[in-house]
Regions:
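Electrostatic cytochrome c docking/interface patches
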Residues: 46-70, 82-85, 89, 114, ...
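A mature extracytoplasmic/lumenal domain signature
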Residues: 81, 148-152, 231
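The canonical Cys-X-X-Cys-His
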Residues: 65, 71-80, 130, 226, ...
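Post-cleavage N-terminal segment of exported redox proteins
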Residues: 1-58, 194-199, 203-204, 229-259
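Short pre-active-site segment immediately N-terminal to redox-active cysteine/selenocysteine motifs
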Residues: 72-76, 81, 114-117, 145
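Surface-exposed patches in mature extracellular/periplasmic domains of secreted proteins
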Residues: 77, 143-149, 237-246
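Electron-transfer interface patches adjacent to heme c in soluble/periplasmic c-type cytochromes
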Residues: 23-32, 90-222, 259
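Sequence context of c-type cytochrome heme-c attachment sites
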Residues: 41-64, 79, 94-108
Length: 259
C-alpha cells in the first residue's frame, strides 16, 4: 500500500517537472506568496530605521573622504558593522545601530574582516597616527598587510562638482538643505583649513571636526578627506549610556553559563 502511494506521488511529481508551463506557474505563485509575506508588513511600519539623536548627513569633506575610501577598496578588508556579541563589543565598542548607516549610499557594513572593524574608529587615534598608518602601515602596525597609500598625501583633493554630489544624495533621501548645497565647495575647503572662515559650518553639521588633518595646512589633499572621514566614524551618536550595552556586558553568552 505504501509503495503504491509513493509510486503515485513520484509519478505525479514527474508530470509536474515535465510540464514546463505548470512548473513555471506554480514557481511564480510560490515566489509571489513569499514576496507578499515579506513586503506587506512594511506598509504598516512608519519607518524601518529608528531615528537616533545626533545623526546628520556627512560634511562635503567627509563625503569626499568616503568616496576615496570606496575608490581605494578599503571596504573590502574593513567592515563597518559591530555585531551584538560580547567579544566584538569589548574590542570595538557599542554594537552598530541601523541609524548610523541611514545616510550611507551605498552602505559599508562589510561581510569580512582582513583588518579591524572601523565603525567606531573616530577619535580613537590621532590624525598623525592615521596619516603615518596610511603612508606606511607597517611602521605603526608591524604585522599589517595593508598596502601603502602615501600618494594620498600628495594628491590634491579634486571634486569636480561638490554641489552636484550633494544634490544627487538629496534625491535618494539624504536631507541636505539648499544652504548646504550652495555652500558645499566653501564648506569642503574650510573644514580642512582652521584659518579659513567656516561660517556656520559647525552649526549645520554638529560635531564636525574643523582642522588640518594631514599636517599640511597649505593645501587640501585626499589624505585630508580620508582622515576627516575616518575621524568622524562612530562619533555622531552618544552610545555610552545605552542600556543595551550594560545588558550585553552583564549577561553571559550562550555556552558561557556555568563557566
Amino acid at each position: 500500500m505504501s509503495n503504491t502511494a509513493n509510486t503515485g506521488a513520484f509519478e505525479g511529481h514527474k508530470k509536474l517537472e515535465r510540464n514546463v508551463t505548470l512548473l513555471a506557474a506554480l514557481t511564480l505563485g510560490v515566489v509571489a506568496i513569499g514576496g507578499i509575506v515579506e513586503i506587506a508588513p512594511l506598509f504598516w511600519i512608519d519607518n524601518t530605521i529608528e531615528k537616533v539623536e545626533g545623526m546628520r548627513p556627512y560634511t562635503p569633506l567627509e563625503q569626499a573622504g568616503r568616496d576615496i575610501y570606496i575608490r581605494e577598496g578599503c571596504y573590502v578588508c574593513h567592515s563597518q558593522m559591530i555585531r551584538p556579541f560580547r567579544d566584538e563589543v569589548e574590542r570595538y565598542g557599542h554594537y552598530s545601530l541601523a541609524a548610523e548607516s541611514m545616510y550611507d549610499h551605498p552602505f559599508q557594513w562589510g561581510s569580512k574582516r582582513t583588518g579591524p572593524d572601523l565603525a567606531r574608529v573616530g577619535n580613537k587615534y590621532s590624525d598623525a597616527w592615521h596619516v603615518q598608518h596610511l603612508k606606511a602601515p607597517r611602521s605603526v602596525v608591524p604585522e599589517s598587510i595593508m598596502p601603502n597609500y602615501s600618494f594620498l598625501a600628495e594628491a590634491p583633493l579634486k571634486v569636480p562638482d561638490v554641489a552636484a554630489n550633494l544634490t544627487a544624495l538629496r534625491h535618494v533621501g539624504v536631507p541636505y538643505s539648499d544652504k548646504d548645497i550652495a555652500a558645499a565647495k566653501t564648506d569642503l575647503e574650510a573644514q580642512a583649513n582652521p584659518e579659513a572662515d567656516a561660517g556656520d559650518l559647525a552649526a549645520r553639521y554638529p560635531k564636525a571636526q574643523i582642522r588640518d588633518f594631514d599636517g599640511d595646512p597649505k593645501r587640501v589633499t585626499e589624505m585630508d578627506a580620508l582622515v576627516a572621514y575616518l575621524q568622524m566614524l562612530g562619533t555622531m551618536v552618544d552610545v555610552n549610556s545605552a542600556a543595551a550595552q550594560e545588558e550585553l556586558s552583564g549577561k553571559p553568552q550562550a555556552g558561557e553559563k556555568g563557566k
